[in-house]
């Protein structure tokens, strides 16, 4: 909303006490965000309250005080670190949330410079979501590092900054400045964040909510050894103090390139843009790239490129006039939890789903969010009626990441986890050691039957592409299909009676069903939906036993001899075949013509691929990714999605990227597609 329109919404009778209460609320949020690294509300809510305070102070300038949040940058530092006074204040940026507010930023510059802002060159950068730092080099050697803190005083984090691998301890130049202060953002890439949380879970430790919290918590450890273990990265965005006989370049963009030339890392997405349309194009381009960047950003930063013009434009109390952060629509918002419903999955898992007051988050309206399980409800301390924080990043399913406790209503209601299935009323049980509660109804439960059918026809199972979720729902609602075998009994007349089913659609579905009869033993096993038997385990079972009869009669001990089959999975396979209903469905499927060739035992004792950990990357030209994976699994290989010290081989197709670089770094054996095919003996 334009600033003027917002101002008109406020009543003239606002009291000083109300304004002070708003300031105190903002101070509390700032303290939790900057000092405790534990945000209480989404950034969007903080920004809204800050705008409200700015507007109230605009209406009542006589009420502005030097300690107002509008006059400061961050929060006071903790006493656990030595304090560092910034010679040049580390200011924050004003924000724009719409094209109209960007226009206002350009228009305001007209009062301070003679040039037309719409023809100026801007240095455009992604707005990294990390922690702002200052790093001082004396005679080219890293001497001191500090957090931004409140803009005037930060915390001395020199020992921790020294542990970050992409920050040089010595500048890459012959005649370094006497003093050079590099300013930048320390952040944690998404992959490193995920691996950090995985390790924490394995150790039973607390996980971080997001990469920013992880970066902040890691950078402000009192023990640098802990920081050294964290995957932190610096991207420089500017220069503070500079003392040298040599002059710096005259533009911001050139200064960043100079920093890069002396070993200081800068972001690869920085571009120059001239005029409004190019600024908007940069914003749109970075927003489109956001899901694939590999690190969190929450907008763009647009800076007048000419340093002389920056100096002419100057500063206001807490930010420069020559730069603005044009932020993306928030990925976090607040809304109210109206109710919780419980869904039943293919394996009987009971999943609580939050029913929310609809809220616009990251470009879409969200009214539902997963709550995962009872443990998550307990961890969040959430009750019906709470104001909650919703996060939606990229294509990730919206989730509740926090509760705003000071907004809990008096009539809030505890969430009661069901003891009976909401679909079939069978008992709900939770096995000791598992987080998930499950319906015990099995295929008696309509919800489990529906999800089992969806799994059966899926691409990696029987691959019946003419039968989708909506068709399965119709078939079940009309009680035309009860088990997977019933799909193979459908005829043209039956399908034509269904809604939105034309002649061509019906025939396509029947053709897909007929085609699916010819499958593989591994696909068939996976399609049966035996709990914890995924693609790889199904392939291992097929390779080990060679035929279905051997699998059906395998003992617990024989199953445990299969690669990656432990006690739990072996038990589940045995129990599956002990259930008469399951055996009847399998026999019915075979009687309907579902068939496959038994797996031929191939002697692979001398093949170097046997039993190895393998990763695929890049574009393969002679095989599809699925074909290559199946071929590897036939040699008993474990196919992984990421490179680690445990990886034996990396098969690199065309345009291989970061996985190839990591494999080279770790000394992993690298095969081309041709070398891989030669090893397998495939033509």
From Swiss-Prot:
GO molecular function, one term: DNA binding
Amino-acid positions noted as binding Zn(2+) in the UniProt annotation, renumbered to this chain: 421, 424, 439, 445
Catalysed reactions listed for this entry: NAD(+) + (deoxyribonucleotide)n-3'-hydroxyl + 5'-phospho-(deoxyribonucleotide)m = (deoxyribonucleotide)n+m + AMP + beta-nicotinamide D-nucleotide
GO terms (BP aspect): DNA repair; DNA replication
Keywords: DNA damage, DNA repair, DNA replication, Ligase, Magnesium, Manganese, Metal-binding, NAD, Zinc
Domain BRCT as annotated: residue spans: 604-683
Recorded superkingdom: Bacteria
Cofactor(s), names only, from the UniProt record: Mg(2+); Mn(2+)
Enzyme kind, highest EC tier: ligase
EC number per UniProt: 6.5.1.2
Binding site for NAD(+): 43-47, 92-93, 125, 148, 185, 303, 327
Catalytic residue positions: 127 (n6-amp-lysine intermediate)
A Gene Ontology term for the protein's cellular component: cytosol
Keyword NAD listed: yes
Function: DNA ligase that catalyzes the formation of phosphodiester linkages between 5'-phosphoryl and 3'-hydroxyl groups in double-stranded DNA using NAD as a coenzyme and as the energy source for the reaction. It is essential for DNA replication and repair of damaged DNA.
Record family assignment: Belongs to the NAD-dependent DNA ligase family. LigA subfamily.
HAMAP family referenced in this protein's UniProt entry, alphabetically: DNA_ligase_A (MF_01588)
Protein name: DNA ligase
Gene coding for it: ligA
